Amino acid sequence: MKARVNTCAVQQSCLQSSALGVLGSIAHPVGRPGEYSGRVMQGKSQVAEFSLHAGPDVDATQVTIDLARIAGSPLVGQPYKAHKYSVNSDGYLMLFVSEGLGGFWVQLSSQGTYRSRVVFDSRRLKSGDLFIATLIRPGTHQAKMPRAVAAIRVRAPEASDKAFQPPPPAGMTCTKTGFVPKRLEVYATQGIVFGFETTSRVQIDLTKPAPARSAKSRRSARWRGRPDIRR
């Protein structure tokens, strides 16, 4: 069986919390019991809808939605396919993209008796939200908020006969005055969890790729998908 290579992940040099792709995911704390509706956008186009029930009696503490899997334009005059989820009201809504070019963002609205109200917009992450980025290309990267920057150095795994097991995710905090810390060093595929103390968004660009190494000095660093932030 041939191994499936996610070319979008391998080639990606820019990650944005406001336009999710295969190397980024978002965790949002639901916070309150209720009925919610979600609108999935890709660029300026709506591509999916979903409903979310949150209650203290629900066992699941996390609901995970693959935006690439549920995306799809309905036939003219037809509604979007129904996607229904449930989660404990103290749990998390996890958004990620498994394949494709990305560019997704989500609005979540609470359903009131007379009107709905937007309670979450993934383009503007707030206190309690998490943006999880997985950088797989060695080199120097720059993390940016609207008025702040930070440097991230991504190291390639050392040569070895054993498969590389990345360390637990590293952490960065987005504050009103900038990133904390302002410099970070991680291994390829390790994962970085961005927490938020202020409303913002994060973009990460590869600014200086590491020099190519010979085949003998390379160690296999397989991207296994989203890092486990519970470790």
Provide a role label for each language-model segment.
Residues 1-231:
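Extracytoplasmic copper-binding redox domains, predominantly the cupredoxin/blue-copper superfamily
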